[in-house]
C-alpha cells in the first residue's frame, strides 16, 4: 500500500518541509508536534499543561483524520525543555491515554521555538481499511 499524506481539515502549512502525518500499511506516523496555532505561533506560553493538551489534541486530529483513535497509539517520542515541567506534562498525557499506555521516551532538549515547552511525535497502528 502506498504512503498516504494525512493533513487534518483546517491545518495550515508547516514551517518546514514536512506534513502532519503519513499513513503506510496501517500505521500512522505523526510528525513532531509543537503547541502552534494556525499561524504557527506558540500558544499557551509558560503553561506546560495547556501546551501539552494542545499538542495531544493536534496529534489526535491527525490520527482521527487517518481513521484511528488515540487508543491506537503504540509509541510516543516526547521532547521537553525543562524537567520541572515533567509532572505537569505527564498529568495531561495520562488524560489522553487512560487505559493501556503506549511505549515512549522523554528527553530534555531545546526546541525550534523558544516559547515551546513540549513537542511530541507519535506512531499509531490503525490497521488496514476494509
From Swiss-Prot:
Q: Which CDD domains match?
A: YjgF_YER057c_UK114_family
Q: Name one GO cellular component term.
A: cytosol
UniProt-listed InterPro entries: RidA_CS (IPR019897), RutC (IPR019898), RutC-like_sf (IPR035959), YjgF/YER057c/UK114 (IPR006175)
Task: Please state the Enzyme Commission number of this protein.
Answer: 3.5.-.-
Endoplasmic reticulum is among the record's keywords: no
Xref: PANTHER family: 2-IMINOBUTANOATE/2-IMINOPROPANOATE DEAMINASE RIDA (PTHR11803), PROTEIN HMF1-RELATED (PTHR11803:SF58)
Q: What is this protein called?
A: 3-aminoacrylate deaminase RutC
Species source reads: Klebsiella pneumoniae subsp. pneumoniae (strain ATCC 700721 / MGH 78578)
Tell me the name of the encoding gene.
rutC
Amino acid at each position: 500500500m502506498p504512503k498516504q499524506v494525512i493533513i487534518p481539515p483546517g491545518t495550515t502549512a508547516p514551517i518546514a518541509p514536512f506534513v502532519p502525518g503519513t499513513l503506510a500499511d496501517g500505521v500512522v506516523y505523526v510528525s513532531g508536534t509543537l503547541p502552534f496555532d494556525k499561524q504557527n505561533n506558540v500558544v499557551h506560553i509558560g503553561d506546560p499543561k495547556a501546551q501539552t493538551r494542545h499538542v495531544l489534541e493536534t496529534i489526535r486530529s491527525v490520527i482521527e483524520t487517518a481513521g484511528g483513535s488515540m487508543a491506537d497509539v503504540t509509541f510516543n517520542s516526547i521532547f521537553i525543555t525543562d524537567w520541572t515541567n515533567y509532572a505537569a506534562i505527564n498529568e495531561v498525557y495520562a488524560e489522553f491515554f487512560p487505559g493501556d499506555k503506549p511505549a515512549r521516551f522523554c528527553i530534555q532538549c531545546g526546541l525550534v521555538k523558544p516559547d515551546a515547552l513540549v513537542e511530541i511525535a507519535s506512531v499509531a497502528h490503525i490497521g488496514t481499511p476494509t
